[in-house]
A protein has these predicted regions:
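Long, contiguous C-terminal modules that act as interaction/assembly or targeting platforms
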Residues: 1-4, 457
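Bacterial N-terminal signal peptides that target proteins for export
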Residues: 3-16
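Bacterial N-terminal signal peptides
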Residues: 15-23
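Hydrophobic alpha-helical elements and their junctions with loops/disorder across both membrane
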Residues: 24-25, 346
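Sec/Tat signal peptide C-region and signal peptidase I cleavage site
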Residues: 26-30
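Surface-exposed, polar/charged interaction patches used for macromolecular assembly or partner binding
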Residues: 31-457
Length: 457
């Protein structure tokens, strides 16, 4: 008898319940012919071009992001997963705020207290430890001074410890007249610039730590099947037979192949009025006045922290692997990228702070933006439309001008790279009914290209 991999009981129970409901529904409607929605997309006049001059130069503030992956040598195919992550393009909706390395070894930061004390973790304790990796991540952040390095990058810290505002000026899109403002300046414009950076730029700095693993589908599929059988045994005869047949169908469909599971932990830097005041008072210096004591204080200090907001999980099914190693590597690589994209989309949907702004690329003939399935867009999702303005002090403000809704079945499928053949979860080629490279919205009026949209609950 094959030993089952540990999986979450709640997950199995949810799937089992779904099978029972589906089984009953199929039984009740077996004689009915399936009705397909034949609504077709109307042809839009003209293709929206992302390089159009009206939108190509749009500048808007993005959140900043540092991405990492956890190394676990015990996992199969980990070399392919790590290589894929390190070679993947950086998410284009964020500023690249990479510091440190892109990965760390899980077992270098495992809690060894129990081992030193001669204690053995119970199976339950080990399972809980494997399920939540935030203690190891937190230890890595503390040992490597990741939060300090994030702040150092924001203020363009040099080897001598001097800071400047060049990166804040660049990402804040302040005009040339603001670039000569020193931190010590008491001008209203200088104060506004610093306050603006503190309110929007630095606090919207995140770290996402990924843990991806390559697993066989069969143990999980078998566990779901067995649990369904056990639950069905308590039901009346006809219902029992229907549920078991539904479980068999699902098992046979999902048992072959593999899946890439990704868990992503989302952290945010703790920049606020208090930390800002301490930074400028105790650590700030420029090239005109180097203070070795301040330099050392910043490097050894623990003022800055990364706060865990939460985590999300996503998986991508691999129905089968190719006959040669090259095909296998490519399949695993694509599945890994898709699982990472999926978990980022879940993080944005779950955590409002992590949501990105996207410019409208067109309002006529259609209201459209360059986001799609890769970002987790769904039918009926609502987005607020924001107009960004800059006041006389250079502070950027956002004013809501309306709310728009994603049009049904008009979502850009950007999960596939240009030239890549679209396939379903079983690896079968599929034909996309909606082939335009933008998502269409409806609602409101008076918008213009360049306005920003952001998802709302």
């Amino acid at each position: 008898m094959k030993k089952l991999l540990p999986i979450r009981k709640s997950f199995i129970n949810q799937v089992v319940a779904s099978i029972l409901v589906v089984g009953f529904t199929v039984s009740a409607s077996a004689q009915k012919e399936e009705v397909k929605d034949k609504d077709k997309d109307k042809k839009e006049s003209g293709k929206i071009d992302a390089t159009d001059k009206s939108t190509a130069s749009i500048k808007y503030r993005r959140s900043s992001l540092h991405t990492m992956i956890i190394e676990d040598a015990k996992l199969p195919k980990i070399d392919i997963i790590l290589r894929t992550f390190n070679e993947a393009p950086f998410p284009d909706k964020y500023n690249d705020h990479t510091v440190n390395g892109k990965s760390f070894n899980l077992y270098d930061y495992k809690d060894t207290t129990a081992i030193v004390a001669g204690e053995e973790l119970s199976k339950k304790e080990q399972k809980e430890a494997d399920k939540d990796m935030s203690p190891e991540i937190n230890k890595y952040f503390a040992d490597s001074k990741t939060a300090n390095k994030i702040i150092a990058k924001w203020f363009s810290r040099k080897e001598n410890g001097a800071f400047d505002m060049s990166l804040i000026e660049e990402r804040g899109m302040y005009d040339a007249s603001s670039q000569d403002i020193a931190v010590a300046s008491s001008t209203a414009r200088g104060d506004a610039m610093l306050a603006d950076a503190g309110e929007e730029l630095l606090p919207n700095t995140f770290v996402v730590v990924n843990y991806s693993k390559f697993v066989s589908n069969e143990p999980i599929a078998l566990a779901i099947k067995n649990s369904t059988y056990a639950l069905a045994a308590t039901k009346p005869g006809a219902f029992k037979e229907i549920a078991e047949k539904a479980a068999d169908v699902l098992y046979n469909k999902t048992k072959d192949g593999y899946s890439v599971w990704t868990t992503a932990y989302l952290y945010q830097i703790n920049w606020n009025d208090s930390t800002s005041a301490v930074f400028y008072q105790n650590y700030w210096m420029d090239d005109s006045k180097i203070d070795p004591a301040k330099k050392e204080a910043f490097e050894k200090g623990d003022l800055f922290k990364l706060e865990l907001l939460g985590f999300q999980k996503a998986s991508i099914l691999i129905s089968g692997l190719g006959a040669n190693a090259k095909d296998e590597d490519m399949i695993i690589k694509n599945a890994t990228l898709k699982s990472i994209d999926a978990v980022y989309a879940k993080l944005q949907r779950k955590f409002e702070k992590f949501r990105t702004k996207t410019p409208l690329t067109s309002v006529e003939p259609v209201l459209a933006a360059k986001i799609g399935l890769k970002e987790g867009v769904e039918n009926g999702d609502k987005y607020e439309v924001l107009e960004q303005t800059v006041d006389e002090l250079g502070k950027v403000n956002y004013k809501r001008k309306g709310v728009i809704t994603v049009e049904k079945n008009k979502i850009w499928n950007n999960k596939f790279a240009p030239g890549e053949e679209p396939v379903d979860e079983e690896g079968n080629p599929i034909k996309l009914e909606y082939t335009l490279d933008f998502t269409s919205f409806k609602g409101g009026k008076g918008y213009y290209p360049g306005m920003l949209i952001r998802q709302i609950n």
